């Protein structure tokens, strides 16, 4: 994130590892009971929003699969953004997460855009990122477009694209000799 790689990273945040039959994930809430933690989680959850912001992401958003049009706009914005975009996506696990259900998020999520949030205000974005309870903000928390991306800072990356797609630049007879030596 700190290098501002031009990449959109979408986190499917269901607060549990459903494919491993319901084990805790880094975003599971403290006290959550699962097969692997029958007495409840003793750890505080990782919060992707402030984590991404302090790590240097230049586009930080959160969406909810229950509000698909809004989520699509956030993803589109992340893809169009020049720099590292993180989109934390609430996607409730219907099998193993019985606490943070679709209905739970439907009742609590509120769009930042409708709350008058300024996505260029770092402090306000951090405050909204830590907000959790009766109101859980979704939308664009933070966006900064004035920082160069890694490919703009690293000249070799802008010189002909990825190395794998560039011509080898080795005479065929030398390449054959190298392969023969390695065999």
Name the predicted role of every residue range.
Residues 1-18, 70-73:
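Thiamine diphosphate
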Residues 8-13, 88-90, 141-143:
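Short beta-strand segments
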Residues 18-19, 69-71, 87, 94-99, ...:
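Short acidic/glycine-rich loop or secondary-structure boundary segments that cap or lie
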Residues 19-31, 51:
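Active-site-proximal loop->helix
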Residues 25-29, 78, 103-106:
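Short, hinge-like loop/turn segments at secondary-structure boundaries
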Residues 32-77:
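Conserved thiamine diphosphate
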Residues 56-63, 82, 89-97:
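Active-site rim beta-loop-alpha module in soluble metabolic enzymes
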Residues 93-183:
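Flexible, low-complexity linker and terminal segments
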């Amino acid at each position: 994130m700190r290098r501002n790689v031009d990449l959109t990273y979408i986190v499917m945040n269901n607060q549990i590892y459903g494919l491993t039959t319901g084990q805790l994930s880094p975003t599971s809430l403290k006290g959550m009971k699962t097969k692997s933690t029958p007495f409840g989680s003793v750890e505080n959850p990782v919060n992707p929003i402030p984590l991404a912001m302090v790590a240097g992401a230049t586009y930080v958003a959160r969406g909810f699969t229950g509000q698909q049009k809004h989520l699509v706009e956030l993803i589109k914005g992340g893809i169009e953004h020049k720099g590292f975009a993180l989109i934390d996506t609430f996607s409730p696990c219907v099998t193993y997460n019985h606490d943070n259900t679709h209905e739970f998020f439907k009742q609590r999520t509120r769009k930042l855009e409708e709350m008058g949030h300024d996505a260029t205000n770092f402090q306000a974005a951090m405050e909204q990122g830590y907000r959790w309870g009766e109101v859980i903000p979704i939308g664009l928390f933070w966006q900064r477009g004035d920082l160069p991306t890694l490919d703009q800072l690293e000249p070799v990356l802008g010189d002909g694209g990825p190395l794998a797609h560039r011509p080898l630049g080795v005479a065929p007879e030398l390449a054959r000799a190298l392969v023969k030596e390695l065999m």
